[in-house]
């Protein structure tokens, strides 16, 4: 779901690839969950990405994981946080998690949210939901 654009301010959309996110076995019950977050600026103004969050839920809406990356953490991973007007950024994440029961892969989804501000400090955000599978 993308919020409405405020005229004269920065706005963003977000996409996750691949969708679904496919768990990659590491060893035993440990998996990597590699995915890219693609952020596009659509309002014609530069924005600064302030936060990327992922809330992972299983059947019944039970939260099974949460990751948050603030601007400092995104920069420490070697990614820029400044997005040019009408530009695009791609962030690659690959969190590693233990999955004690393979049945948890059934009905798992992740809601990804990207928060940003433009040069007038006007906040904008975008979110999308993807599925996760083995």
Residue ranges and their predicted role:
Residues 3-13:
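Proline/serine/threonine-rich low-complexity linkers at boundaries of modular beta-sandwich domains
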Residues 12-27:
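A structural motif detector for short, solvent-exposed N-terminal "entry" segments of globular domains
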Residues 17-18, 29-36, 107-110:
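Short, solvent-exposed loop/turn segments enriched in Ser/Thr/Gly
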Residues 39-43:
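Asparagine-centered strand-capping/turn motif at beta-strand->loop junctions
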Residues 55-69:
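Short aromatic-acidic-glycine turn motif
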Residues 71-111:
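Short, solvent-exposed, Trp/other aromatic-anchored flexible loops in extracytoplasmic proteins
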Residues 99-134:
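Terminal connector regions
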């Amino acid at each position: 779901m993308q919020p409405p654009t405020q005229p004269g301010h920065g706005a963003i959309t977000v996409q996750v690839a691949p969708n679904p996110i496919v768990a990659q076995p590491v060893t035993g019950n440990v998996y990597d969950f590699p995915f890219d977050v693609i952020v596009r600026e659509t309002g014609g103004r530069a924005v600064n990405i302030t936060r990327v969050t992922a809330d992972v839920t299983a059947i019944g809406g039970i939260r099974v994981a949460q990751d948050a990356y603030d601007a400092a953490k995104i920069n420490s991973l070697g990614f820029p946080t400044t997005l040019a007007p009408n530009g695009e950024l791609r962030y690659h994440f690959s969190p590693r998690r233990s999955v004690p029961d393979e049945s948890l892969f059934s009905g798992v989804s992740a809601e990804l949210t990207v928060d940003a501000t433009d040069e007038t400090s006007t906040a904008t955000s975008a979110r999308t939901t993807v599925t996760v599978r083995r």
